[in-house]
Amino acid sequence: MDSRAPTRRSALAGLFFITAVSACGGGRSAPPVTAAAPGTTSSAVRGLEVPVSVAFERAVAQGTRTRTGVPGPRYWQQWADYRLEAELNPISKRLTGKGTVTYYNRSPDTLHEVYVELLHNIFAPGARHNTDVPWSVEGVELSRVAAQGQQLKVTEKEGPGYEVDGTIMRIRLPKPLPPGGSAAFDFAWKLRIPPDGAPRGGQDGETFFINYWYPQMAVYDDINGWQTDQYLGNAEFYMGYGNYDVALTLPAGWLVTSTGRLLNPSEVLSGQTRARLDTASHAKGIVRVVTEADRSAGTSTTAGTNGKLTWRFRADSVRDVSWATSSKYLWDATNAAVGDANGDGRPDTTAINAFYRPERRTSHWDESARYSRHSIEFFSRYLLPYPYPHMTAVDGPTSCGGMEYPMMTCIGGQWDTLGLYEVTTHEIGHMWFPMLVGSDEKRYAWMDEGLTQFDQSQSMADFFKGFDDEERNRRNYLNLAETGGEVELMRHGDRYPSYSSYGVASYYKPATMLVALRGVLGPETFNKAYTEYARRWLYKHPSPSDLFHTFEDVSGQDLSWFWRTWLYETWKLDQAIDTVSPAGDSLDVVIENRGKAPMPVHLAVTRTDGQVQQLTVPANVWFGGERRRTLRIAREPAVKSIEIDPKREFPDIDRSNQAWPR
């Protein structure tokens, strides 16, 4: 069933009524509480304000952003076209590369310098990092840097030249780059692939996952300008979009898979392999494209020239390119239905691949293609159609853990069935956030990890019918919250006091927050706003304010109180039924807000005749600091039980005080 199917709680029936009784002042009656539909708040109460940066306000004034969440009429972002060539020597573990990057200045600013990311420099001896980088192999060895046709040298003096500081290279241009102009940059470099244990990739025997392997233009955006934060290992990335043409040279017999579409299959794949791929493109099941027998016979690739093959790939509108290669890989393939991805009114499909070593069958990798197919099809229905030509899961070094790249995911280690599906669907969920919706992962990890963790829960519930991954997220968040060890979500990914606080703030709490927001708005409105956010910011760079404004624009509600509570503070939610007592022909139900987090109170009153009444007290009753509210409900038919938040939508820190009788 489509998880977006709208459901609504019943409105307040005439049989029951709610009256607010002041918690102080000698029992004097307060104005009646409006029995609101789920998620509504009084427009008369503004609520808690959300801090807005001066930079965002400036962007609004300049017309690049809006207060409705729609990109502004003057929105712009930079672009780059990459032509890259690389050869990997599997014996020496060395990669030799060269390339030309054409950078397009779509900003209104004249640029006198540009910044380039050399992410592999995290492996240089003495490099700065805040996570375990056990291998100091070497950084990027640059042999050529040219800009606008001029060879550049390392220099800290003014004038044309470049300098490297950790993972950031600054290039001072020979000529200013005006708005609407472009500049070509030429690079040649060498680097060594780190062994297993390096974060997010590396090599493990005859298996390589190659990431962050080329000079990449840093982001220059309309809010913060150049993004020059160092890559320290914990906080992830903020990458611009572009087109890539990539040529990769490997020994014949080594399979290669990469971001992008393979342009020369007849030159690198055997006829048998190509025929099986063609079958997989329309098969209902999984096709074993390359088997162990094919490996033994050496029939997976062509013979090549001088024992080498060059694989050519083209990737459009992506923020990065990664690739994997091995002399041991098996290859499974199928296809996935993604809906109308190109807007021509007809359904589309995408290729699904799994590359893995034979020994990984014990980790259920022979099911990987099936898991990937379900994930792509589910997210294409739940969010937006998947637009890329393939989705490929790669068995990589153990230190990959689970890591996302455009059209690819690297998964390392041993897994059971549940674990392999979970990591697969999570990393595939990242194809939407941040691959298609390109947020700043460094500053706002929750915008990609938290949203993807939430999406993972929806996918797992669909695949493992009845599995409640949302409860796992909620429990992981509450376990830390109960200790007082959590920190706010609006924090740079490199500035958390511990990995546990980073993990909760980036994954579990924001995923739990989205479940709560769905409870506030109702599933129909929530899903409409969620997909609208993705649609508006497809291939763009949203900030948190753009997400906030989109939800408020679609729902028609001021949600500043919600964002402030769950993103900027570490307030805890503790809603309790304090007392239930007779009041003539009515019952007075005293609700207490024992925590600092203001949220609506969703109350289920179950009567002995089987009727269940859903009542809602809006969140704004708590905005002024009030801690207690008395709800007066009809006494007959007799009340069997009363429960706060019966659907478990809100992360309350103490469930034991939410039901009557206890």
Please tell me what each predicted stretch does:
Residues 47-48, 94, 104, 133-206, ...:
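A surface-exposed beta-strand-loop module
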Residues 219-221, 225, 235-425, 454:
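Hydrophobic helix-coil surface modules that form long, contiguous segments used
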